[in-house]
């Protein structure tokens, strides 16, 4: 991470272009100041919270320091075990070894503590990612539910309109049937009158005097 470069100039040899996240967390937005940075990143930078990048860098530095201490310790052992080494050199090496041994216990505690901090931050980031994905899925389901309700309402409206039209047609058909029934009733009455006239003529032999049928 320390090899990342956030400047606007040419990237130095042995370094690489820093990511937006790294540059924002490091308060170095010289390069990304030329471009539009995601607003959420800037909001995150404003919040005072422990940065995983910084804590990981601290852990890496401690591990590197431990490697150097181990290397120095092994070199001091070589000096002490070498028969050609002078007495003063051996005494000096032993004194330095004692200092390293004393520092070792504290150093191991520091590394352990820093590793726990980094692991906690990693777990926290994973939980935040899961929560964000869960929120996205919930939002998608909410949108789908709204669309489904809207379509269902539209279909119901069309069905109601169709039912109304069908009812109107049924009403017209009923009126037509009523008209036909009335016409049939009139025809029946006329037929009865005609039958009476015919019977009267048959019984009295023609038209009665003074009446026109």
Curated annotation (Swiss-Prot):
Q: Where is the composition biased (Basic and acidic residues)?
A: 122-142
| Low complexity: bias regions | 146-188
Q: Where is the composition biased (Basic residues)?
A: 189-199
Instruction: Extract the ranges annotated as region (Disordered).
Output: 122-213
Keywords, alphabetical = Coiled coil
Where are the coiled-coil regions? Answer: 54-78, 108-151
Family named by the database record: Belongs to the mimivirus R546 family.
Q: What is this protein called?
A: Uncharacterized protein R546
